[in-house]
Design a protein with these regions (language model features):
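Bacterial Sec-dependent N-terminal signal peptides
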Residues: 1-39
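Cationic-aromatic interfacial patches
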Residues: 36-103
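Mature, folded catalytic cores of secreted/periplasmic enzymes
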Residues: 44-50, 59-65, 111, 191, ...
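Residues that form generic nucleotide/phosphate-binding pockets
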Residues: 48-51, 67-71, 125, 129, ...
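Acidic/His-rich structured neighborhood in mature extracellular/periplasmic domains
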Residues: 75-206, 226, 250, 259-262
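Short alpha-helix capping/helix-loop boundary micro-motifs
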Residues: 210-221, 235
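Short, surface-exposed secondary-structure edge patches
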Residues: 220-224, 240
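C-terminal soluble interaction/assembly domains
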Residues: 229-295
């Protein structure tokens, strides 16, 4: 009987200990989320949820487009991910650059499709999208080059690269702007070890097979580009793979470009069609088209 009594207390202690660990885990997660989201972000997220809570049954592309449209009029803010000296997950719903606009719209859409949009789910989705293998492990783990972002998010099953099927042609990206001009990047200044790691990534990008649709052929592909497709504009600038990113939207059967343009402007939809918009940029070479996949 005494042995049974001791066993009971041992089991009871272990259960209490396990419950305490679980409780502390959730408390810690709550604290970390609170640090990531400021009060303004929380207000924006609650408003977004209220306006989009009945979209889970819709096609993922349509939900991405709706998420993007929610941010029309939001201020462009540069370097939103370069806060502090250490790499951490940044959520900024009130100021976006072109990349964070695209990533945030995709992350919100995936969370909606999963039927669980809250602060922690958004953090999880952004981490999965923004970092190599979905793991935040320092500055180099962030997918800085869009071409690298494409490869990794295709591998993770988050998007499909449909560029080739839309008439895309082979392109080689000699991406090296980060290693050649580290002084332009706050976290790379005077850090040769980090620059060497970036070089390794750049060399990998050069070896991969990529496709893009040249500017002259975009109009022919527009009908097959869907609402919510992610658009990456390839570059003629030496060392740069992609100039700009955004989201395709449809109006009256035509395709337009929704994006966060240069500093001083706001998230908007192009007045001209996608092909006309891209051809208007002297340094634009073509586009890659990435199709969001159902989570």
């Amino acid at each position: 009987m005494r042995a049974q009594f001791q066993l009971y207390h041992q089991m009871s202690f272990k259960m209490k200990k396990a419950s305490l660990i679980i409780f502390l885990f959730f408390v810690l997660a709550e604290m970390l989320t609170a640090q990531i989201f400021n009060e303004k972000d929380k207000i924006v997220l609650r408003d977004f949820i209220n306006k989009n809570e009945n979209t889970a049954s819709e096609d993922i592309g349509e939900v991405v487009a709706k998420a993007g449209k929610y941010f029309i009029g939001t201020e462009y803010v540069a370097h939103t991910l370069e806060v502090g000296d250490e790499e951490k997950l940044i959520v900024n719903l009130s100021g976006l650059d072109c990349t964070t606009f695209m990533e945030t719209s995709l992350a919100l859409a995936r969370a909606l499709k999963k039927g669980k949009l809250d602060e922690q789910t958004l953090v999880n989705e952004l981490t999965a999208i923004r970092y190599r293998g979905g793991v935040l492990d320092g500055y180099v783990s962030r997918l800085h080059y869009t071409s690298d972002w494409v490869t990794d998010n295709v591998k993770k099953g988050i998007v499909a690269d449909v560029t080739k099927s839309l008439g895309g042609e082979r392109i080689v990206f000699n991406a090296n702007i980060m290693s050649e001009k580290p002084e332009l990047y706050k976290r790379l200044k005077n850090k040769p070890a980090l620059v060497e790691k970036i070089k390794e990534i750049e060399n990998s990008i050069k070896q991969r097979e990529y496709y893009h649709i040249p500017v002259s052929k975009i109009e022919q592909a527009e009908d097959r580009i869907k609402a919510g497709d992610l658009i990456a504009i390839t570059s003629t600038i030496s060392g740069v793979d992609v100039n700009h990113v955004g989201i395709a939207v449809k109006r009256n059967g035509k395709t337009y470009f929704m994006h966060a343009p240069m500093a001083g402007k706001k998230v908007q939809i192009s007045e001209s069609t996608l092909g006309d918009y891209i051809s208007g940029g002297r340094k634009n070479k073509g586009i890659m088209v990435l199709r969001p996949l159902e989570p």
